[in-house]
Amino acid sequence: MGIRPTLQTNPLVDLLISTSQTQLQNAGLPFPPRSFGCLLVRHSPGCLPGSLWNLPRSRLPSCLPICLPRCRCWLNRERWRKGDDVFSDFCTKFVSTLIGPTSFAFRFVEFFYL
């Protein structure tokens, strides 16, 4: 998918990058058109927790952009939280398929329409 991480790689990032179209389809998840994507938001000073829509664009290079199927939801260590827009079984299934229920290297994850 031509992804170049901007942060030091870790097992979660490696898992997301190595997830292919076939793997997603085998998991019952549709692969997105190129016009869709998401950002993994790292919980760090350069990538503040909160809404990406309020994050200054100049701060985005310190985050980690990854191309993933479309959906919008929030994930944190303790529980799923309903976001302002779409929260669906698709989001839950997609994130739990890729990351698993207990393995979080990133505290906040948001999937959204580009």
UniProtKB/Swiss-Prot annotation:
Q: Which UniProt keywords apply?
A: Disulfide bond, Neurotoxin, Secreted, Signal, Toxin
Output the Gene Ontology terms for molecular function: toxin activity
Tissue distribution of the protein: Expressed by the venom gland.
Please give the superkingdom of this protein's source.
Eukaryota
- Compartments where found: Secreted
Q: Post-translational modification, briefly?
A: Contains 3 disulfide bonds.
First-listed, main subcellular location of the protein, grouped into a coarse class: secreted
Q: Tell me which GO cellular component terms the UniProt record holds.
A: extracellular region
Family, per the entry?
Answer: Belongs to the scolopendra neurotoxin 8 family.
Q: What is this protein called?
A: Putative neurotoxin 7
